Amino acid sequence: MVSISNVSKGAIIRWKGEPHSIESLVHRTPGNLRAFYQASMKNLKTGRNVEYRFSATEQVDVIVTERKKYQYLYRDGEDYVMMDTETFDQINVPEVAIGSASRFIKDAVMVDIVFADDGSILEVELPTFVELEVTETNPASKDDRATSGTKPAIVETGAEVNVPMFIQTGSIIRIDTRSGEYMDRVKK
């Protein structure tokens, strides 16, 4: 157990019996009240975001983690099958561990898997950006190209992304896996 004041952003703690990742931690001292830490956390089992106010002296249980590189192989029902690139062992990863970024996973992509000290999977981190081919989008007319609007496009993984009007079917685009937003077009 350590004091909340010694915990930083990105740490994984056990809070109310479940693992949580600290997304942000801000120290506040309002007027003549006692200091506290305002924490924004992500429950790693359910994927839900939680806000909590810790007292400045509160103790939390920090989980010791191990990070390993894995390669995505294929989907098996609700699970994603990943392979350890060193030992070639395969593991099944539940979709909830990957979160909303699962819609951008394509074959052979490398991911970081964070394991707890008991061997359970806490989270799966995809690369920040992925390059995917647009498989379906409405063709842009001459009038559309002059304006700065967006249109929906389906990429090779089946995800829908809003793209600029000049993007056509067959274009390769870069997508931010954290937000699901179009970043730019990849030149070949």
From Swiss-Prot:
One of its GO terms (molecular function) is translation elongation factor activity. This is Elongation factor P. Pfam families: EFP, EFP_N, Elong-fact-P_C. Belongs to the elongation factor P family. SMART domains: EFP, Elong-fact-P_C. GO terms for cellular component: cytoplasm. It is found in: Cytoplasm.
